[in-house]
Design a protein with these regions (language model features):
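Short gly/ser/thr-rich secondary-structure transition/capping motifs
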Residues: 1-6
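Beta1/beta-strand and adjacent pyrophosphate-binding region of the FAD-binding site
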Residues: 13-25
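N-terminal Rossmann-fold NAD(P) dinucleotide-binding loop
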Residues: 28
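The Walker A (P-loop) glycine that initiates the GxxxxGKT/S ATP-binding motif of P-loop NTPases
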Residues: 22-23, 46-47, 132
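Residue-level detector of conserved catalytic or cofactor/ligand-binding positions
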Residues: 126-136
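Conserved N-terminal/central alpha/beta ligand/cofactor-binding core
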Residues: 8, 16, 34, 40-41, ...
C-alpha cells in the first residue's frame, strides 16, 4: 500500500462549536435546526451559496414525494415546518398529497430559519479534514 507523508503543520482554528453539520440539504438543515433549538452551539457548512440542498440547488422542490400513497403516515417535524412556511408565503403548490416548494423563496425561508435558531452559517465552504481527537 502506498502512503503519502505530510509534513507537520500548524493550522489556525477558525472557530469551535459543539455541533458541526456539513451539508444543508433537507437532512442537514433539519439536524442543525434541531440541535440549535435545543440550545447547542451549532455551525452549518454549505459548499454552495444558499441552504436547502436538493430543494434549492437541483430544483427538486419537494421532500415529501413519499406521501403519494394514502397509507403513508407523516411524522411532521421540521420537514412539515418547511412546507408550512412556504404555504404562508404562497410559495408552494399542492400536488396529490405533497407540496412543491418555490425554490427561490425557500432560500429565504431557510436563511430565516437558520438565523432564528442562532446557527452560525458558513456558506461557500467545504470540509476537508476533521482532527482525530474530536471526530465523532
Amino acid at each position: 500500500m502506498k502512503h503519502i507523508e505530510e509534513p507537520a503543520r500548524k493550522t489556525p482554528v477558525m472557530a469551535e462549536t459543539d455541533v458541526l453539520v456539513v451539508g444543508s440539504g433537507p437532512g442537514g438543515l433539519s439536524a442543525a435546526l434541531a440541535a440549535a433549538r435545543e440550545g447547542v452551539d451549532t455551525m452549518l457548512v454549505e459548499r454552495h451559496g444558499c441552504f436547502g440542498g436538493v430543494i434549492t440547488q437541483t430544483i427538486v422542490g419537494t421532500l415529501a414525494w413519499y406521501r403519494t400513497s394514502p397509507e403513508t403516515v407523516d411524522a411532521g417535524g421540521i420537514g412539515a415546518e418547511f412546507e408550512q412556511r412556504a404555504k404562508e408565503r404562497d410559495a408552494s403548490l399542492t400536488v396529490q398529497r405533497y407540496e412543491i416548494l418555490d425554490t427561490e423563496v425557500f432560500k429565504v425561508i431557510a436563511d430565516e430559519m437558520v438565523q432564528e435558531a442562532g446557527i452560525t452559517p458558513l456558506l461557500h465552504l467545504s470540509l476537508i479534514h476533521i482532527s482525530e481527537p474530536t471526530r465523532r
